[in-house]
Amino acid sequence: LLSRRQRQMCIRDRGTFKGLDYFKWAKEMDVVSWDNYPSYDTPWSSIAMTHDLMRGLKDEPFMLMEQTPSQQNWQKYNSLKRPGQMRAQSYQTLAHGADTIQFFQLRRSVGGCEKFHGAVIAHVGNENTRVFREVAQLGAELESFGDRTLGSRNEAEVGLIFDWDNYWALEYTSGPSEDLKYVDQIHQYYQYFYKKNIGVDMIPVDAVFSKYKIVVA
């Protein structure tokens, strides 16, 4: 429990876990954030949808708390990001409403469960690596923007309802099929608009629908 004395403390959360209604929880949060760790075969539209969900939780810009500049741990393949991939993913994050781009981790671990996770500074310990140069380049580009993009809002014509009650009803029951996954179904709707370059807001069931030309439920 955080006391009233800690009024200057910023409260945030991260992730997209099934067990908690994020729209309800976001009302108690100061800032919404999440960690973007796609697999080598994760569709770009899936990443974009999660960005839009994070933005939609408070209808405000969010924070990207973590991404790896290179390879990432705890997946089937700890694949290394190709040249330019991290930069492209970072700009995708900004385009979908993020105010920050942050990395985990700064320096490569020498042990522990994330010893194979990527880092800005590799074991070689200097700046003479492709990954370090790419991060430095991105930092310089973002610095050149100043504060022009901070607090900016996305104007979407489509509202796509993401409802945790339906999420739970579908996946916490024994039917109609274990292969029917809520997020995958929502992504199919989202992907249609993504491929046509149509902006989407991920919204709760009690959102104001009148601002949208189309609401998908």
Name the predicted role of every residue range:
Residues 8, 26-217:
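Carbohydrate-binding surfaces of carbohydrate-active enzymes
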